[in-house]
Amino acid sequence: MQVSVESTSALERRMTVGVPAERIETEVNKRLQQTARRAKIPGFRPGKVPMSVIRQRYEASARQEAMGDLIQETFYEAVVEQKLNPAGSPSVEPKSFEKGKDLEYIATFEVFPEFTVSGLEDIKVERLQAEVSDADVDNMLDVLRKQNTRFEVVERAAQNDDQLNIDFVGKIDGEAFAGGSAKGTLLVLGSGRMIAGFEEGLVGAKAGEERVLNLTFPEDYQNLDLANKAAEFTVTVNSVAEPKLPELNEEFFALFGVKETGLDGFRAEVQKNMERELRQAIKSKVKNQVMEGLLQANPIEVPKALIGNEVNRLRVQAVQQFGGNIKPDQLPAELFEEQAKRRVVLGLIVAEVVKQHELKADEGRVREMIEEMASAYQEPEQVVAWYFKNEPQLNEVRSVVLEEQVVDTVLQKATVTDKQVSYEEAVKPAEAPQAA
C-alpha cells in the first residue's frame, strides 16, 4: 500500500492512498465465493452455480462493495502508519477505479492539533473566602417567607407590594394594539413588570376605580413596533390585596421537607444548604477563572469538524430547552459558533492537561461528590446507591471530578489570591465569559 500525505493547512491533510490490484481482486473473489454459497438461481442447485454465472450476475456489485470497504479499511491503516489523528470523517475522492488496476484515492480530512499546555505560571486566580453568618440565615429566611407570600383582599388604597387584580386597555393614537389589553391580570406594585409609570400610576387606587395612564414605551422596548411610542392605558382596579408573610412555624417548615425540628432545626437546615451553595459557588468561580486562564495562555486552532459537531449538539439542547415546533437544523449555526468553539478548545486543553499530568479520576472524590449531591435529598442513601448502580451517571461524575483535578493541578502553579467577601457577593453569579 502506497501512502503520501500533504499538509494543505495547519490542520487539514490531503492523503493519497494506493491499494494494490491483487488485494482488490482477493476481496472481490472472497465476496463472490460467499455469494455462490447462498445464491438461488433457477436451473442450478444451491451452492452449485458455476463461478462464471456468479461473476456475470454479481461481480459489479461485489466490486463496488469491496472498493467501499477497502477504502474505509485502508484509510485507517494509512492514518495509523502515518501517525495521524483524524478529527471527523474524511472526504474521499477516487482517482483510479478501473478493474485490474491499483485503486488510488485521495482522502481529505482534519487532524487534532498537537500542542503542549503551557503558561500555567502566568494564570492569576482570585479565590473568594466567605462564611454564612446568622444575619445571612436571617436574610434567607426572609427570602423564603417572601417566596411563599399570600395575598389577602383589603378595602383600602393600593400601595407598593400590594397585589392588584386589574383590567386594562392600551391604545396608541386612539387604536388598541396587539398585546396591549388584558382582563383579570394580577400585578404586584413595585415589581417592575410593566413599563415605567404604569405601576406607579396605580398607587393610591381603590377597588372599582378607573385610572387613565399616559405613558411612553422605552426606546429599548423588546417590541420594536412599540418602542418610544406614546400610549394611553385605561385601567380598572378590580381588587387590592396586601401581602401576608407566613409565620415561621411547623406548617411553614414542612413546605421544605423539614418536620418536627422547630425553628432551630429549620435554621440549621437552611444554613447547611447555604453553606453547600457557597462551596459550589466559590468552586465554580475558581474553575471559570482557571479555564479562562488556560484559554488565554494556549490559543490553539481547532478542527472545523469538531466545532460543527458541537454546534449541532447546542442546537439540539436549545430545542429541548425552549421547545417549539422547530427542528435543530433550522436554527442558524452562527448563533452557536462562538460558544461551540470555546467548548471545543477548552475540551482539548483539559484533555491535554490530563494527558500531560497522567491524571485519573480520584474514586474517593467521586464518592464525596455523590454524597454531597445526595445530601440535598430526603433519602440520600438511595441517591448514592442509584449513582453507583448506573455506570453512565457515575462516569459523568468521574468526568466532573477529573475536571476538578485539572483545576487543582493548575492552581498548584498559578498565582492565587484569597479575597474575603460577604456571602451575598460570593454566591452572586459571575459574568458570562467571552467566547474564545
From Swiss-Prot:
Span of domain PPIase FKBP-type: 161-246
The record's Gene Ontology cellular component field reads: cytoplasm
Enzyme Commission number, as recorded: 5.2.1.8
Per the record, the GO terms for biological process are: 'de novo' cotranslational protein folding; cell division; chaperone-mediated protein folding; protein transport; protein unfolding
> What is one Pfam family matched by this protein?
Trigger_C
Matches recorded under SUPFAM superfamilies: FKBP-like (SSF54534), Triger factor/SurA peptide-binding domain-like (SSF109998), Trigger factor ribosome-binding domain (SSF102735)
The record comments on the domains as follows: Consists of 3 domains; the N-terminus binds the ribosome, the middle domain has PPIase activity, while the C-terminus has intrinsic chaperone activity on its own.
- PANTHER family given in the database record: TRIGGER FACTOR CHAPERONE AND PEPTIDYL-PROLYL CIS/TRANS ISOMERASE, TRIGGER FACTOR-LIKE PROTEIN TIG, CHLOROPLASTIC
Q: Which NCBIfam families match?
A: tig
* Described function: Involved in protein export. Acts as a chaperone by maintaining the newly synthesized protein in an open conformation. Functions as a peptidyl-prolyl cis-trans isomerase.
Which protein is depicted? Trigger factor
- What is the organism of origin for this protein? Pseudomonas aeruginosa (strain ATCC 15692 / DSM 22644 / CIP 104116 / JCM 14847 / LMG 12228 / 1C / PRS 101 / PAO1)
Q: What is the lineage of its organism?
A: Bacteria, Pseudomonadati, Pseudomonadota, Gammaproteobacteria, Pseudomonadales
